[in-house]
């Protein structure tokens, strides 16, 4: 289907790019991206994907908007406090871009529902704030052969990596297992600078856009870290040997999804 005159104007700064053009914009409009977590990472990622014209955006989050969220979760407004995050996010996106269909999942992801939720999406963004959820997302995406972007933020630091089936290590290749409960402070205990979510969440959106367009180099096989205090990015090459991984290796020992105990941070 041809782009409308309004779409040509709306996405004109995309279309003029040789890496995008009208063909690439149509790819974006036909794409489906799932964001798990409508918080500090998921909020900016969702807004930039919506602005870019990603045609279907899924948002999964069981929580309600809290006043303390507004310091960084820019998709929500003061009037949204007490509202379901998925509903608040949907309303913001609908007001921003009528080209975008928003699917909402007001539920915690578990081993029982995640495969059904992710099955229809082209790319998954992990915007969660706890290790059990991150390992569950990783394992589900590996088993379902879904590309995804992992990210995490705390204090003045952030990190992200991208997994594409068959093109490098997964999250479990690098981090093996969740740390013991209480071994790592929650975001409520440690704090996080608000703009950190904007920096890292926007990079997650960029990874999704590049994957959809098929342009550039993704963060497969690399972990990108950012320190806002020193204003330094570091791109760390990850081990390329994935054969021994418990989930994506040649002889996986994890063949069923695991529900580790989740400690939900109201400030993610």
Regions found by a protein language model. Name each.
Residues 1-268:
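Adenine nucleotide-associated cytosolic modules
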């Amino acid at each position: 289907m041809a782009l409308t005159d309004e779409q040509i104007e709306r996405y004109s700064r995309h279309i003029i790019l040789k890496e995008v053009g009208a063909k690439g914009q149509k790819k974006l409009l036909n794409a489906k991206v799932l964001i798990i977590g409508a918080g500090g990472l998921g909020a900016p990622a969702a807004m930039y994907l919506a602005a870019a014209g990603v045609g279907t955006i899924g948002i999964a989050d069981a929580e309600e908007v809290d006043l303390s969220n507004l310091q960084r979760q820019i998709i929500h407004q003061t009037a949204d406090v007490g509202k379901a995050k998925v509903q608040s996010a949907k309303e913001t996106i609908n007001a921003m871009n009528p080209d975008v269909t928003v699917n909402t999942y007001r539920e915690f992801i578990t081993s029982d529902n995640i495969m059904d939720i992710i099955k229809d999406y082209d790319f998954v963004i992990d915007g969660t704030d706890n290790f059990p959820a991150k390992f569950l997302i990783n394992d589900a995406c590996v088993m379902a052969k879904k590309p995804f972007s992992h990210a995490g933020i705390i204090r003045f630091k952030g990190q992200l990596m991208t997994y594409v089936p068959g093109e490098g290590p997964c999250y479990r290749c690098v981090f093996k297992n969740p740390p013991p409960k209480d071994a790592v402070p929650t975001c409520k205990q440690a704090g996080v600078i608000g703009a950190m979510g904007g920096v890292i969440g926007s990079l997650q959106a960029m990874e999704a856009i590049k994957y959809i367009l098929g342009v550039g180099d993704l963060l497969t096989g690399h972990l990108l870290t950012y320190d806002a205090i020193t204003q330094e990015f570091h791109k760390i090459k990850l081990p390329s040997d994935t054969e021994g991984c418990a989930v994506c290796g040649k002889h996986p020992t994890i063949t069923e999804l695991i529900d580790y105990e989740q400690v939900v941070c109201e400030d993610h």
